[in-house]
């Protein structure tokens, strides 16, 4: 890790602890990882702040300016979680950030972050040179309709919603955070080093001196409840695109993957072995290499 990155990480941790985000000279909250070369923009997933992705993004810093969106759940004065009415707001935020950069950019998104990139790319294709969508969230239309019509029922009956709101989110120190997450099945393919990135970058110290998740579970739940139906967007996508699936994903199902390749034949679609929905953390070096090869092709 470079000394500049160490300084950046310390500043970002301080900013998150104080309720701020890194702004520099751009108006939409973001983090600037590096400065030099063409711009790569990154859009993070629900529940995973940008600095958790250090292992994935580090290879891009060598020859590129790397800037990551900071989505609304991490903003200062972002309002209550119910102020997020749709993921379309996240797409609008990406769309609002990019004109202040040197365009067009290469944009990478993971999960919810890929939906934000996709929405912005469909609305403003001139802002983008290429896009990479990692494990885009694709749900059946009926599911989004149910979530919109019956949010209270979804909170009570949807296993993911119950799991999110009931999870432990406060610990006495970061060793306790690591010890809590290390045995989790969802993190089984993630190395200790990358898991520590999540622990160090995904927690802040509260007013009682405890370590808590920087990305609150109330905001995380709201993002799940406001999932957007992205299927139709792929039919309108004109920007060159690479779509990535973790070969063992339980989020982007095999059935959805097959359908996606049919409705978006203009996109290049690849799978990363020995990985699932968290492929940016499970296989960061392989994924970064695949993306760089595609960018240069």
Task: State what each model feature region is.
Residues 32-79:
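Conserved HGGG/HGGXW glycine-rich cap/lid loop of the alpha/beta-hydrolase fold
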Residues 41-45, 110, 245:
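The conserved beta1-alpha1 loop
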Residues 71-108, 147-149, 289:
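Active-site loop/oxyanion-hole signature of alpha/beta-hydrolase fold enzymes
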Residues 104-145:
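Conserved hydrolase catalytic core segment
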Residues 131-170:
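Flexible "cap/lid" loop of the alpha/beta hydrolase fold
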Residues 165-224:
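Conserved alpha/beta-hydrolase catalytic His-Asp/Glu region
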Residues 202-259:
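Conserved serine/cysteine hydrolase catalytic core
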Residues 275-284:
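Catalytic histidine-centered segment of alpha/beta-hydrolase-like enzymes
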């Amino acid at each position: 890790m470079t000394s500049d990155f160490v300084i950046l990480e310390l500043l970002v941790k301080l900013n998150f602890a104080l309720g701020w985000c890194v702004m520099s000279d751009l108006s939409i909250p973001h983090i600037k990882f590096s400065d030099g070369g063409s711009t790569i923009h990154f859009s993070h997933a629900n529940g995973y702040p940008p600095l958790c992705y250090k292992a994935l993004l580090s290879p891009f810093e060598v020859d590129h300016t790397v800037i990551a969106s900071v989505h609304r759940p991490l903003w200062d004065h972002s309002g209550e979680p119910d102020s997020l009415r749709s993921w379309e707001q996240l797409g609008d935020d990406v769309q609002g950030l990019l004109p202040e950069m040197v365009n067009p950019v290469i944009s990478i998104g993971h999960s919810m972050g890929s939906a934000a990139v996709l929405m912005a790319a469909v609305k403003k294709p001139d802002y983008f040179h290429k896009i990479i969508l990692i494990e885009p969230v694709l749900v059946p239309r009926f599911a989004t309709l149910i979530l919109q019509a019956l949010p209270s029922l979804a909170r009570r009956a949807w296993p993911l919603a119950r799991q999110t709101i009931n999870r432990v989110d406060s610990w006495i120190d970061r060793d306790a955070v690591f010890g809590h997450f290390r045995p989790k099945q969802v993190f089984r393919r993630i190395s200790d080093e990358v898991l520590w990135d999540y622990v160090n970058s995904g927690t802040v110290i509260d007013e009682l001196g405890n370590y808590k998740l920087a990305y609150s579970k109330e905001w995380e739940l709201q993002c799940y409840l406001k999932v957007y139906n992205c299927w139709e967007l792929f039919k309108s996508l004109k920007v060159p695109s690479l779509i990535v699936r973790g070969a063992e994903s339980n989020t982007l199902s095999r059935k959805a993957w097959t359908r996606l390749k049919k409705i978006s034949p203009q996109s290049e679609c690849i799978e990363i072995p020995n990985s699932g929905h968290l492929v940016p953390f499970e296989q960061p070096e392989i994924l970064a290499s695949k993306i760089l090869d595609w960018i240069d092709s």
